[in-house]
């Protein structure tokens, strides 16, 4: 069997290991916690992050990074955004041939405002990169682990052939994979939906009901599309799986860490209390800071993102943030389209 390595022993990395094992790949999961790795190998289950999901015999785990990445042509990067640079910096010294690197995280680096593929280019020497591919879409690990029907998108930095190779690698009767040439749009949609999911959780925590959440999801998508398009993404991408698809599932499901975190904020918990209680990475918090900075850099109106930024980092009450959003100056719903049309008519 062909060997594939997954860097990251969390819920998503483990779920993807199950998909690849079902497709008859020899899967090696790398993680840094000795007790977790031992548990996966002994019980064929990740009880910490994906309990109840049994892994097949062709999935093994290791803390030895060299053993994980040496002689491997496909490396899945499934660690949180903040850990990607550190893990790749360690891994590159052990990689001995060109490989396709597939990242499955969703975020933006706050300090540099780089997308994940851009971060990876800085850490992986060109002579070791066959290509960089992103896999994204509405895909809770818990449901993938149960082999429920799931559909995602892959996009490659350099060639459609790389995207198609990863499509072939993952696709089976339970896990459908599309390709999309718009890597910028795919990455931005996947990252920014976490910001809107935090806000959606807040509205639920406040008990505001379906009307408020429907409006927030819709206007949140408008913010994502505005920024993503300004950064070079294709507007159509945001109407697809990595745009509205991922946004819906993350804003409405109890499986969503970002929704759960927002829900606690809406119920009055402080951010520090929320993060401690969650015990898992909540990407939307860091991404909110990055998205706010990007909105200023590209001069894009993102009122929901700005309001959430005030709640998370300036201590504003969630009720005050909602009041500010509702009191904004009246405007046309399709403001961007109207402005574009008017400019074309001049």
Swiss-Prot record:
The active site is at residue 193. The keyword Transmembrane does not apply. NADPH binds at residues 11-12, 32-33, 106, 141, 257, 281, 283. One of its GO terms (cellular component) is cytosol. It is found in: Cytoplasm. It catalyses: sn-glycerol 3-phosphate + NAD(+) = dihydroxyacetone phosphate + NADH + H(+); sn-glycerol 3-phosphate + NADP(+) = dihydroxyacetone phosphate + NADPH + H(+). The keyword Disulfide bond does not apply. GO terms for biological process: carbohydrate metabolic process; glycerol-3-phosphate biosynthetic process; glycerol-3-phosphate catabolic process; glycerophospholipid metabolic process; phospholipid biosynthetic process. InterPro entries: 6-PGluconate_DH-like_C_sf (IPR008927), 6PGD_dom2 (IPR013328), G3P_DH_NAD-dep (IPR006168), G3P_DH_NAD-dep_C (IPR006109), G3P_DH_NAD-dep_N (IPR011128), NAD(P)-bd_dom_sf (IPR036291). Gene3D superfamilies: N-(1-d-carboxylethyl)-l-norvaline Dehydrogenase, domain 2 (1.10.1040.10), NAD(P)-binding Rossmann-like Domain (3.40.50.720). Keywords: Cytoplasm, Lipid biosynthesis, Lipid metabolism, NAD, NADP, Nucleotide-binding, Oxidoreductase, Phospholipid biosynthesis, Phospholipid metabolism. NCBIfam families: PRK00094.1-2, PRK00094.1-3, PRK00094.1-4. This is Glycerol-3-phosphate dehydrogenase [NAD(P)+]. It comes from Bacillus licheniformis (strain ATCC 14580 / DSM 13 / JCM 2505 / CCUG 7422 / NBRC 12200 / NCIMB 9375 / NCTC 10341 / NRRL NRS-1264 / Gibson 46). The lineage of its organism: Bacteria, Bacillati, Bacillota, Bacilli, Bacillales. The gene is gpsA.
């Amino acid at each position: 069997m062909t060997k594939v390595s997954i860097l990251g022993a969390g819920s998503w990395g483990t779920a993807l290991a199950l998909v690849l094992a079902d497709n008859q790949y020899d899967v090696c999961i790398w993680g840094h916690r000795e007790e977790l790795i031992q548990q996966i190998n002994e019980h064929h289950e990740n009880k910490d992050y994906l309990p109840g999901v049994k892994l097949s015999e062709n999935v093994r785990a290791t803390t030895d990074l060299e053993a994980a990445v040496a002689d491997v042509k496909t490396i899945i990067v499934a660690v949180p955004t903040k850990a990607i640079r550190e893990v790749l910096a360690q891994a590159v010294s052990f990689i001995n041939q060109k490989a396709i690197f597939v990242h499955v995280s969703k975020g933006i680096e706050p300090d540099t405002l780089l997308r994940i593929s851009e971060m990876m280019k800085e850490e992986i020497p060109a002579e070791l990169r066959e290509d960089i591919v992103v896999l994204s879409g509405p895909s809770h690990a818990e449901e993938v682990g149960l082999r429920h029907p799931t559909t995602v998108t892959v996009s490659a930095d350099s060639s459609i052939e790389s995207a198609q190779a990863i499509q072939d690698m993952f696709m089976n009767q339970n896990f459908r994979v599309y390709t999309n040439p718009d890597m910028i749009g795919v990455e931005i949609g996947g990252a920014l939906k976490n910001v809107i999911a935090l806000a959606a959780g807040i509205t639920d925590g406040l008990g505001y009901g379906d009307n408020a959440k429907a409006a927030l999801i819709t206007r949140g998508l408008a913010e994502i599309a505005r920024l993503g398009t300004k950064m070079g993404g294709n507007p159509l991408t945001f109407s697809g799986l990595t745009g509205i698809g991922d946004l819906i599932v993350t804003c409405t499901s109890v499986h969503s860490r970002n929704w759960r975190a927002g829900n606690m904020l809406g119920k009055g918990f402080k951010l520090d209390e929320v993060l401690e209680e969650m015990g898992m990475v909540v990407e939307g918090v860091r991404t909110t800071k990055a998205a706010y900075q990007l909105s200023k850099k590209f001069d894009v109106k993102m009122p929901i993102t700005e309001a959430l930024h005030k709640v998370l980092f300036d201590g504003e009450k969630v009720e005050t943030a909602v009041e500010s959003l509702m009191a904004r100056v009246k405007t046309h719903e399709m403001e961007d389209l109207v402005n574009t049309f008017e400019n074309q008519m001049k």
